[in-house]
Amino acid sequence: MLPVFHLGPFNDWQEEAMRQRALFPVAYPGPQTRQRVKEVLGFCCGPEPALDVRSEGTWERDGVAGEAVSWSAGYGPRTQAWLLKPAGAQGRLPGIVALHDHGGFKFYGREKIADGPEPADPVVTAFRERAYGGRAYANELARRGFAVLVHDTFMWGSRRFPVESMPENIRRMAAQRDPAWQPTDGSAHAEEIADYNYAAWLFEFHVIEKYCALFG
């Protein structure tokens, strides 16, 4: 264990904590360890099925057949998702759940890695160039023979928090956007997205991280 040097007069805190007990408990593979991990992380111990699953429409473009689906996680807004398959595919396919990145970009979720029925937002296209080599990788996987489920995760896209629901202090800080969060093309639309992404980052750091630590 590397020594701690940035805690000032509390630099010996780490040493005392390690003296009282091992930093990492011994965890042998098996059901007991899996159960302990669930308890520590606050996972639900029972089944967690998607609720009220709905099909919202279908499309086909560029060799991919898509279906828009949505479901309830039991709290918050409905989760919007796309199920992508090779066009014309029949029968069962190997499946992949494709997850988008964090990227400090919460305005969109699934759109960052997948093309849906409409052309991608230019802001998303620019982001893909930086993060994914310009590709919608979920569609690439579908064209190669996979059934790919792409959904908005908690805090992104359809599951994002509206700015008006954020505390006043977060909105005040967000009004003074850090220059590092400037959009690339300078359009009004890009400015709106950059404003939201900065506010959402502040909200995650100052508020949501704390709730997640408490709720699991």
Task: Cite the ranges covered by each PLM segment.
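N-terminal targeting or regulatory segments adjacent to alpha/beta-hydrolase or S9 domains
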Residues: 1-65, 73, 109, 144
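Conserved, well-structured beta-alpha core segment at the onset of a catalytic domain
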Residues: 57-61, 88-91, 140
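Short coil/loop residues immediately preceding or within conserved phosphate-binding loops
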Residues: 66-68, 78
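Residue-level recognition of well-ordered beta-strand positions that form the cores
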Residues: 70-72, 82
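Proline/glycine-enriched tight loop/beta-turn segments at coil->beta junctions
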Residues: 76-79, 86-96, 102-105
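Mature, folded catalytic cores of secreted/periplasmic enzymes
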Residues: 81, 91, 209-212
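Catalytic micro-motifs at enzyme active sites that drive phosphoryl/nucleotidyl and oxygen chemistry
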Residues: 84-85, 137
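Cap/lid segment of the alpha/beta-hydrolase catalytic domain
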Residues: 100-216
